[in-house]
Amino acid sequence: MLTRQSRLLRRIPPPNAVLQSGLQRRHRSTDRYSNNIHTSSTQNAPAPVYDAPIREKGMTIEAKERVRAHARKIQSSASTAAASPAVRPQPAQHFQAAPQPMPANTPRFESDGQVKNGLDYSFIGLSGGQIFQEMMLRHDVKQVFGYPGGAILPVFDAIYNSPHFDFVLPRHEQGAGHMAEGYARVSGKPGVVLVTSGPGATNVITPMQDALSDGVPMVVFCGQVATNLIGSDAFQEADVVGISRSCTKWNVMVKDIAELPRRINEAFKIATTGRPGPVLVDLPKDVTAAILRTPIPAKSAQPGHSPYLPSNPLNPSSQPSDPLPGDADLITEAAQMINKAKRPIIFAGNGVLSSPEGPKLLKELSDKGRIPVTTTLQGLGAFDERDEKSLHMIGMHGSAYANFAMQEADVLIALGVRFDDRVTGKVDTFAPAAKAAAAEGRGGIIHFEIQPKNINKIVEAQIPVLGDVVASLAELVPQIEAVDRSAWIGRCKATKERYPFTYTPSQEGQKLKPQEVVQELDRQAEALGKEKFIISTGVGQHQMWACQYYRWTEPRSWVSSGGLGTMGFGLPSAIGAKVAAPEKYVIDIDGDASFSMTAMELATASQYDIGVKVLLFNNEFQGMVEQWQDLFYENRYSHTRMTNPDFVKLSESMGTKGLRCTKLEDLPRMMKEFLEYDGKRPIVLECLVSSEHVYPMIPAGKALHEQLLHPLLRNGSE
């Protein structure tokens, strides 16, 4: 009877089979075994004996030695030991190749006269990087924000010393994204970002989500490893198409150089069509380094002419056309409801700012119908707040009088808004008078919106008008009748006087109040001309005080992160805004916590002579979080206190002028110096401010009329 060990040995395959299967499994040549494998045939090798019974432990070792000895005698032919095919194909021709010298001023390649039979021959002989530059020219791109890296070098080499557009190099890719947002919000043109693969691309995820939340057009081009390396966990490889799918309107990887012009056209069209937003184009290195050898369809190389672009439900034609208004019958029905209303209110959002005509039509609607206007945070500037019909911003930290008026209105005219939770408060209790009027057939909610998914998503509208908001307004305004609503306007005016924005002024020897700083800026900006000013902010209490105490009068003068609430947004977005409007005062009102997240971008502003002005509130706290901890967490300040650097010295170390204001009596003089400083150089004015709460405030889960008022107003609350 065989022992257990001998039975196991019977199951071992012949040694030559073991060796050959091992070689196949590893895809290796026989070089590593050349010291102990012969090159002659193995056919006559004697078969090993496995059947000898093993009764002692020592014999186990002896049996193993016999197997090893037999393995050393195995002979192998060259054909048997040949290496298996490589796991990957050879890299593309241009991958890892030394870049070819590019002329200092790459010429523009005109397609006129090079289109035959519907094919464009103008790109033949150009690299993917050169095609990228040409497409930027065709889309009239004047500014690019980005950061180089290995996978995107063919593109950076193609735009080397390009005279056709300017490039701003930030200190972090997130900064590039926010700069592109600021540029887009002020100019109305899509912001363009160019970064490398891996971390370069993932660092732009936050700006893309921010742009998606606030409807900002942005086109992000990122490098990628060569196509033959995709999926191999190569250096700086990341599935950025998968990662960015939920934070972009559309994304794509370009897999062949011939499709590059078409994909770029699609990106710009989708970013700017309908509700604007971010798109991403992933560019593998071998695609941007390759040379185009064949003509491409002419239409695919022309901006706005992409025959493969999915149809826009509002514009089925692939050709450019004017924005389409909503259904004419619904617009007429909306006009009839407005004309019959006794207490209508206009609720204007960012959609009104999508066209220069939007604010003009909004004013005409308000004046003609004698209708008060309130705005969202992103709608600031759409309506002149000096107008007596202005109710300023609505919502969690909006004006008390706007919140009260919203609850009393019998007709709500919502223009380009999403009904965000910061605006509605508890949805079930939002606009109760309008809902009651709808039930009685004498009023209700009218919602003008371009994005279908926003219709009836949060608040049910009695008249939903799907289409371009500004185009719909152009159809609506002529149908509005002049109605005497002096009683309603008078009630709104009385409420404004009863519940103004309020704070307790600072006393001698005390720190500045942040509200005082914003009011001084507003006073001096009014004297210089509000049309010359653009204000950006970070996220936090300072953002709300800027909304409340600066009087907004001009479209596209407000740049802030609303939907996502991105701390660190203020400074880089101000840089982008200043690039878009170099002739204007661009001021970043920021808090110490928010500013610290992207403070290194001061070095960018200094390097490129971008004259942004940072008005910095320093209270050494994460103020908004501290306020919630005060009100709802029994003053337990869990990790909200800041230890800050010397911001003046920090600014000076980056080539930026720094000022510090500690007393109210010095504020007017220092604000004047701050505003009059060289418009081509950045400056920081740090104001040491006290910790304050932002009022009014609507607690989570409460209705608009259940807002917390400033202590000075609470005795008179309704």
UniProtKB/Swiss-Prot annotation:
Keyword list, A-Z: Amino-acid biosynthesis, Branched-chain amino acid biosynthesis, FAD, Flavoprotein, Magnesium, Metal-binding, Mitochondrion, Thiamine pyrophosphate, Transferase, Transit peptide
Superkingdom assignment: Eukaryota
Region Disordered, annotated ranges: 1-50, 72-101, 296-327
Molecular functions per Gene Ontology: acetolactate synthase activity; flavin adenine dinucleotide binding; magnesium ion binding; thiamine pyrophosphate binding
One of the Pfam families matching this protein, by short name: TPP_enzyme_C
Binding site for thiamine diphosphate: 173
Reaction(s) the record says it catalyses: 2 pyruvate + H(+) = (2S)-2-acetolactate + CO2
Cellular component terms (Gene Ontology): acetolactate synthase complex; mitochondrion
Enzyme class at the top of the EC tree: transferase
Gene3D superfamilies hit by this protein: 3.40.50.970, TPP-binding domain
Enzyme Commission (EC) number: 2.2.1.6
CDD domains, A to Z: TPP_AHAS (cd02015), TPP_PYR_POX_like (cd07035)
Feature: compositional bias, Low complexity: 76-99, 306-325
Annotated region (Thiamine pyrophosphate binding), positions in chain: 541-621
Disulfide bonds: none
Cofactor(s) required, per the database record: Mg(2+); thiamine diphosphate
Protein family membership: Belongs to the TPP enzyme family.
This protein's name: Acetolactate synthase, mitochondrial
Originating species: Cryptococcus neoformans var. neoformans serotype D (strain JEC21 / ATCC MYA-565) (Filobasidiella neoformans)
Gene: ILV2
